[in-house]
């Protein structure tokens, strides 16, 4: 557990690869900012300033997608399954979460980005929440965090 905290504490605030940016909160490098807290104007400014065409974020525990192009800003929810991206638009994609669901569905949610096909495949997977809660409590983590997994 302390080794994990040290590892996480030494990570960079963002990472770029394959024409894509990865950041926990909001681009360019915030780990604390929530996507849903920001105005459309702020989202547009961020997308315009990004050198990458795709940006994956976390922090919200939701499957959100925001894109910007000639037709303006579009916002919505990613659905389970294959989602095709428009090569002419820039995107901020919230990748869901394993734990602490915000949508009433406590399955782990993750996605696979295919940079060649420019698709995002959203997947939901059941997992043993009770076992995870038990391990969290045994590790001395706060009970409120363990209970949020349900």
Q: Residues of each region from the PLM?
A:
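Conserved catalytic scaffold of divalent metal-dependent phosphoesterases
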Residues: 1-56, 60-75
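Acidic, His/Gly-rich catalytic cores of divalent-metal-dependent hydrolytic chemistry
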Residues: 70-150
């Amino acid at each position: 557990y302390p080794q994990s905290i040290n590892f996480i504490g030494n990570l960079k605030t963002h990472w770029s690869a394959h024409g894509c940016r990865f950041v926990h909160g909001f681009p360019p490098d915030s780990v604390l900012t929530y996507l849903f807290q920001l105005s459309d104007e702020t989202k547009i400014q961020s997308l315009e300033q990004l050198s990458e065409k795709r940006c994956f974020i976390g922090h919200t525990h939701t499957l959100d997608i925001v894109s910007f192009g000639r037709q303006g800003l579009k916002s919505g929810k990613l659905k389970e399954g294959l989602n095709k991206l428009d090569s002419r638009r820039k995107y901020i994609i919230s990748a869901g979460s394993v734990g602490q669901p915000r949508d009433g569905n406590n399955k782990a949610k993750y996605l696979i980005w295919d940079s060649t096909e420019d698709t995002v495949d959203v997947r939901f997977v059941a997992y043993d929440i009770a076992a995870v809660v038990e391990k969290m409590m045994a590790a001395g983590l706060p009970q409120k965090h363990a209970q949020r997994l349900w």
